[in-house]
């Protein structure tokens, strides 16, 4: 990303017209660049909570480009059941909920799956508990999760349409990740200058440990 142009700091609103954008583009094409400084650090990212209705809609919109109503329609189908090997199987729990909590039984099953499939390296010493910050949250239901965490998305891909697969995959991965250890990332920040000193850049590279 560009951090400065002709000595002026660049922020999100900097490129207010096409002329500025073209100027930056020309500098990028005509200059020779070199790395001035490298900063390295380790970042720990805690897992996100399981989905409730609003976070499922938001994430499906940002990652899958599904509208809120589209997400709920697909989720309804997964909740009502999918025909798999001549049997109708409900794949997710009730999709209208404010809750981000999971039952003890489901947490135990998820942790067993993590240990078996990924190894104890990715399993915290204790279960991770999530509580809603929203006052008066309707928590009669659990968070949205697969009814059977052992049913992997790829195992049932042939029985789902494309949209169903994408949403189930999203829910399954979020549920598994919610009970895993924090992700450790080695992050390198590169400060990049040019010989003409009319534009500076920053690049951030990350690698999971």
Per-region residue spans from a language model:
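Core catalytic DNA strand-manipulation module of type IA topoisomerases
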Residues: 1-209
